[in-house]
């Protein structure tokens, strides 16, 4: 059992018989009332985000989730095909299930696929990925004086803000949790 005092971002709980992930939470103490935990939770099957208030100390079941390492093979229409690294079985996952994680996945990349009751739910790419800049504006002399940023479109279609010195063709390290540029990778 998981208590509200153990809540943290990314924790998965079972609420009303369905798997949810905690996106954000805040412990709130109110005058002359019992404290509550104001929580944003994301339904792992549908991706819908709910805002719920739980009494402090309420307990939740831990969902029966299974994590498998799979390799991304290719896209086929509105689905993406992955291969189980142990059984070599191939599964097709609809684009809606993958969500924004698709911006961090390249061919042959190993990802974690979270299963709930035998059904693939969530794709979790590695925490950091290296992606190449497909297009960005050229840097001009004097741009770096202000230390600003510019948009850059990466090979997967993701657009991130990068420093002015980044050019088309550069390899960048990206944080998949925030979608932010971390550093330029030396090749």
From Swiss-Prot:
SUPFAM superfamilies cross-referenced by the UniProt entry: Nucleic acid-binding proteins, Translation proteins SH3-like domain
GO terms for biological process, alphabetical: peptide biosynthetic process
Main location: cytoplasm
Cellular location(s): Cytoplasm
Domain of life: Bacteria
GO cellular component, one term: cytoplasm
Coiled coil: none
GO MF terms, alphabetically ordered: translation elongation factor activity
UniProt xrefs under PROSITE patterns: EFP
Function per UniProt: Involved in peptide bond synthesis. Stimulates efficient translation and peptide-bond synthesis on native or reconstituted 70S ribosomes in vitro. Probably functions indirectly by altering the affinity of the ribosome for aminoacyl-tRNA, thus increasing their reactivity as acceptors for peptidyl transferase.
PANTHER family (alphabetical): ELONGATION FACTOR P, ELONGATION FACTOR P (EF-P) FAMILY PROTEIN
Annotated protein name in UniProt: Elongation factor P
Native organism: Thermodesulfovibrio yellowstonii (strain ATCC 51303 / DSM 11347 / YP87)
């Amino acid at each position: 059992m998981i208590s509200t005092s153990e809540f943290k971002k990314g924790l998965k709980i079972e609420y009303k018989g369905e798997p949810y992930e905690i996106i954000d939470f805040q412990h709130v103490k109110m005058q002359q009332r019992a404290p509550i935990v104001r929580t944003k939770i994301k339904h792992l099957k549908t991706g819908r985000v709910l805002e719920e208030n739980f009494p402090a100390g309420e307990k939740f079941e831990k969902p029966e989730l299974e994590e498998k390492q799979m390799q991304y093979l290719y896209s086929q229409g509105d689905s993406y095909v992955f291969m189980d690294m142990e059984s070599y079985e191939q599964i097709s996952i609809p684009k809606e299930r993958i969500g924004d994680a698709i911006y961090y996945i390249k061919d042959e990349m190993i990802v974690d696929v979270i299963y709930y009751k035998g059904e693939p739910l969530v794709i979790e790419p590695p925490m950091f990925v290296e992606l190449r800049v497909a297009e960005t504006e050229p840097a001009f002399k004097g741009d770096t004086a202000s230390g600003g940023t510019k948009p850059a479109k990466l090979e997967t279609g993701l657009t991130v803000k990068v420093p002015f010195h980044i050019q088309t063709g550069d390899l960048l390290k990206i944080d998949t949790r925030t979608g932010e540029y971390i550093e330029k990778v030396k090749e």
